[in-house]
Amino acid sequence: IGLGIPAEPLFRSFRFKLTHDEVLAAEQKEVLAKAGYDISRLDNGRKLVLITGHRRENFGDGFINMCTAIRDLKDKYADVDFVYPMHLNPNVRKPIHEVFGEDLKGLGNMFFIEPLQYLEFVYLMSKSTIVLTDSGGIQEEAPGLGKPVLVMRDTTERPEALASGTVHLVGTDYHKIMDEVSKLLDDKAAYDKMSKAVNPYGDGKACRRIVDFFKNK
């Protein structure tokens, strides 16, 4: 406006941006609802632990330990939702059924849902409190959203994330998973330390810096 550009087109563009974002959010909410989770459950400040698991090295006892810890955490924290988009691999689904039973519906605050497309998953991750995962990529993505990541592996190929404090290793040890998730849910200082740690993968301003670079050329 200060440059003499008429205000109306700018405001029209701004309104379009808001409307576009609202439409995308509505679409993602609808996809999540069809997959088995109603995101509006979080409207009153309810917390969410997002879970993923698929690593081959965790098949067998590792997944049993993970699922047992998740089951006990969901019982311990009735005011927290636990959402697990299940990988299609039978080696992942079998231990889930062994621990939670054949019927995965009606488990209170535990929601096993079908796999999500990337945008819906990122949307769900943005609404989460903690991410509990054995994924490599999520260790890079979640810190950009300010989400602490507990990695259910004994090692990580993202040592920079470990060093910066955005991720912690818990392995598939029942007690470590229980203790670390409980600490982040109960201890605000511990949560803030992880969620506000410096993201080793950038501050989200790369696009702005690139634009500024070319503008100043």
Feature roles, as predicted:
Residues 23-29, 168-217:
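Leloir-type glycosyltransferase catalytic cores
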Residues 122-162:
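A donor-sugar binding/catalytic signature common to diverse glycosyltransferases
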